[in-house]
C-alpha cells in the first residue's frame, strides 16, 4: 500500500499515476478530541501505523504527524522537505523510545560521485519517471506565472526556461 496525502484533491490523479494506491485529504478526516485526527486516522486504516512515512512539505506540524503515524517498534519517518529558517521540530520522547525512527534525507541519500552516474544511466534507459514530474514550462519573462502554478497547486513542477 502506498498512501498519498495532500490537501489538494486535484493531486489525487497525479499521485495514483506515480504509484499511490490510496489518497487521503486531511480536510476530509473528521476532527477528534484529544489528539491529532490524521495520526489516529492513519493508525486506524493501517492496523497500527505506517511502516514508512516521507514528509516533503517542510511543514513542522506535518513532520511530527508523519512520525507519530508510524508503527511502534519499526516505523521510519523520513523528512525531505525543508522547514522555514529558524523553525524547530519536536515530539515527545515516547515516540522514539517505542522504536520509531526519525531521519532526514538530502538528495535521497545518493552519493554523488559513486551512485549518481548509475542513476542517470537508469533514467536514460527509462527506468525512472522524471520528465513526467514537469507539468508546466514558462520562459523567464513569465516566472511569476510559474510560481503561481506552484502556489495554486496546478502543477507538480514548473521549469523556468532561462533561454
Across the structure, where does each feature detected by a protein language model lie?
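Residues in the short beta-alpha loop(s) of Rossmann-like NAD(P)-binding domains
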Residues: 8, 83, 108
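Short, hinge-like loop/turn segments at secondary-structure boundaries
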Residues: 19-24, 44-45, 95-97, 120-123, ...
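Short acidic/polar active-site loop segments enriched in Thr and Asp
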Residues: 21, 75, 156
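C-terminal hydrophobic helical "lid"/dimerization subdomain
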Residues: 48, 64-68, 113-163
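Short glycine-/small-residue-rich Rossmann-like dinucleotide-binding loops
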Residues: 58, 81-82
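Helix-to-beta-strand junctions that scaffold the AdoMet/dcAdoMet cofactor pocket
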Residues: 70-72
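Rossmann-fold dehydrogenase core element
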Residues: 76-78, 90-132
Amino acid at each position: 500500500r502506498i498512501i498519498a496525502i495532500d490537501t489538494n484533491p486535484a493531486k489525487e490523479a497525479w499521485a495514483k499515476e506515480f504509484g499511490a494506491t490510496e489518497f487521503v485529504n486531511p480536510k476530509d478526516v473528521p476532527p477528534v478530541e484529544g489528539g491529532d485526527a490524521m495520526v489516529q486516522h492513519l493508525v486506524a486504516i493501517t492496523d497500527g501505523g505506517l511502516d514508512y512515512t516521507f514528509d516533503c512539505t517542510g511543514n513542522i506540524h506535518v513532520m511530527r504527524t508523519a512520525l507519530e503515524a508510524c508503527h511502534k517498534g519499526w516505523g521510519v519517518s523520513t523528512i525531505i522537505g525543508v522547514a522555514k529558517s529558524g523553525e524547530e521540530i519536536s515530539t515527545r520522547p515516547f515516540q522514539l523510545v517505542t522504536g520509531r525512527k526519525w531521519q532526514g534525507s538530502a538528495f535521497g541519500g545518493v552519493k554523488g560521485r559513486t551512485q549518481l552516474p548509475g542513476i542517470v544511466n537508469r533514467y536514460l534507459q527509462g527506468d525512472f519517471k522524471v520528465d513526467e514530474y514537469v507539468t508546466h514550462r514558462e520562459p523567464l519573462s513569465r516566472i511569476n506565472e510559474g510560481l503561481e502554478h506552484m502556489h495554486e497547486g496546478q502543477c507538480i513542477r514548473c521549469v523556468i526556461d532561462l533561454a
